[in-house]
Design a protein with these regions (language model features):
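Structural signature of hydrophobic alpha-helical transmembrane segments
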Residues: 50-60, 82-83, 101-118, 160-169, ...
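C-terminal ends of transmembrane helices
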Residues: 63-76, 120-134, 176-187, 236-246, ...
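Cytoplasmic-side transmembrane-helix entry/capping segments in multi-pass membrane proteins
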Residues: 78-86, 133-144, 162-167, 188-199, ...
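Hydrophobic alpha-helical transmembrane segments in multi-pass integral membrane proteins
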Residues: 96-97, 151-158, 205-215, 262-278
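Small-residue-rich transmembrane alpha-helices that serve as helix-helix interface/gating elements
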Residues: 167-170, 229-230, 280-294
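Selected transmembrane alpha-helices and immediately adjacent juxtamembrane segments
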Residues: 181-221
Length: 304
């Protein structure tokens, strides 16, 4: 990440210098308003863009692979807790900051807190639907709940403090409202070999699509889409299909616990990214998310 940031900053400074030279003798020089392009609308550096593309394609699949193996080794709660970390929103937010600037990324992060609330509605809807429906019906109802909640929240104008409070209170309430499904969830059962590659492919493709959409849909919807339940929609139906409704609910419990770390990450990005810069801001946010998730997972497992 430090290499990408340094490479990007050097390229942007070269672009500003080139734009200034070109504007000499012109009455209305074209401003450099987006760090992704020079004043002559050329990309800043093809090598930097290629490097960002490769990181987009491989970072999230690697994290999905790690969380899936953790679920098999330590159970669905731990696996879900790891999946609840900002594995999608973190890398996607970083790439948005690199492509569109820190101000755009910080504003999108503020909207992401409301998107996290919509993701909690997804989790709660899936957990209760799993008692009556299979994975397909539960996924459809959960997606409907997310989209409806996201649409309503996009119409709400609230400050950052209120959004932070909502991103903490809603996951806590959802944890208490999860259904208790009797039975066992043996995650050690053999799974078809094609499932993990499919999960990894879907995750990498989703990050690529989200970052490319950011410049089209604007800051608010970019922030909401950063918390789109991509990993939840991959891990939870697979757990439901393979190990039953109880495994799906336990995975969701871990996901909700991981949302506190995601909220911490997003809050730090929204408040500290512009003054600290990309490298320091994202490093501090990642550390804060990890420590918060460890603390919450310890408390959740202790109560169980």
């Amino acid at each position: 990440m430090l290499f990408v940031t340094r490479y990007y900053n050097d390229t942007f400074q070269q672009g500003k210098h080139r734009a200034k030279k070109k504007s000499v003798g012109q009455s209305n020089p074209q401003p450099v308003c987006c760090p992704t392009y020079y004043a002559d609308n050329r990309p800043p550096n093809q090598g930097c863009r290629l490097l960002c593309l490769l990181i987009k394609l491989f970072t999230t699949p690697a994290l999905i692979w790690a969380s899936t193996l953790a679920a098999r080794r330590w159970g669905p709660v731990i696996g879900g807790g790891l999946a609840g970390l900002p594995f999608i929103s973190g890398p996607a937010s970083l790439f948005i900051a690199v492509q569109y600037g820190t101000a755009f990324a910080a504003s999108a992060a503020a909207s992401s807190l409301l998107g996290a609330v919509a993701s909690c509605c997804y989790c709660l809807a899936y957990a209760h639907s799993a008692r009556r429906f299979g994975w397909a019906g539960s996924l459809a109802l959960a997606m409907l709940a997310f989209l409806l909640c996201a649409f309503l929240l996009s119409r709400v104008s609230c400050g950052l403090p209120i959004a932070v409070c909502l991103s903490i209170a809603v996951p806590a309430a959802c944890l208490r409202l999860l259904p208790d499904i009797p039975g066992t969830a043996d995650m050690r059962r053999v799974q078809p070999p094609w499932r993990l590659p499919v999960q990894m492919f879907c995750g990498g493709l989703s990050v690529l699509i989200l970052t490319e959409l950011a410049g089209v849909v604007g800051e608010q919807w970019s922030g909401i889409l950063l918390t789109f339940p991509i990993i939840s929609s991959i891990l939870t139906p697979f757990a439901h299909l393979s190990f039953g409704a109880r495994a799906a609910v336990l995975t969701i419990r871990g996901l909700l616990a991981g949302f506190f770390g995601t909220s911490c990450f997003i809050t730090i990005i929204a408040t500290c990214l512009e003054p600290l810069g990309i490298a320091a801001g994202y490093c501090i946010a990642a550390l804060g998310a990890l420590l918060t998730s460890i603390l919450i997972m310890y408390c959740v497992n202790k109560r169980r």
